[in-house]
Amino acid sequence: MKKIVFALTLSLIIPRGLVFANNEIKGETPAKTARKAWEASPEGIAFKKWEASAAGKKVYAGEAKIRKSIREFSNMNAVVTSLMLPQGSRLGYGIMVNINGDDYVLAFGVESKHEFDQLRKLKVNDKIMIKSHNVSHAPKYAFPIVAGDNIERNGKLIYKRVPGKGGC
């Protein structure tokens, strides 16, 4: 009886192992294939060059400095350095801030229904507290891009991002 149970169990385990091994051998997922194709394109090559350049490394170093605060959604002290984004930017409304000695783009996106009125009252050298869930980068910008989720000034909340409807 034990031999029969052992033989049946073994006959079920071996085909499963072969199926899983075959899935791993098949290779890359479509996402990996698409990424490799993009990396081989002119845009992908330019992006890789930017990542390896001094400007790209500076942006990544700036992201690394605030990564813990982003992950924990904790307060970051900032000073407003400019009320306008760099020339030619397409991030919607935003300002330039200095956090711990590094400059960042603080982006809010496209305005709807006067939601940025309190932000427009900010002045250069105002001290604010930022909470954010996201920091990103792009070769077009020489600074990391922080998405402003909550902005406080003098302990008063002046902006809170409204989450999008439908999930994300």
Ranges and model annotations:
Residues 1-4:
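Positively charged n-region of N-terminal signal peptides that target proteins for export
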Residues 6, 19-72, 166-168:
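OB/S1-fold single-stranded nucleic-acid-binding modules
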Residues 71-91:
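Structural detector for short beta-strands of small beta-barrel domains
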Residues 79-83, 106-118:
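N-terminal post-signal-peptidase region of extra-cytosolic proteins
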Residues 135-167:
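OB-fold/S1-family single-stranded nucleic acid-binding modules
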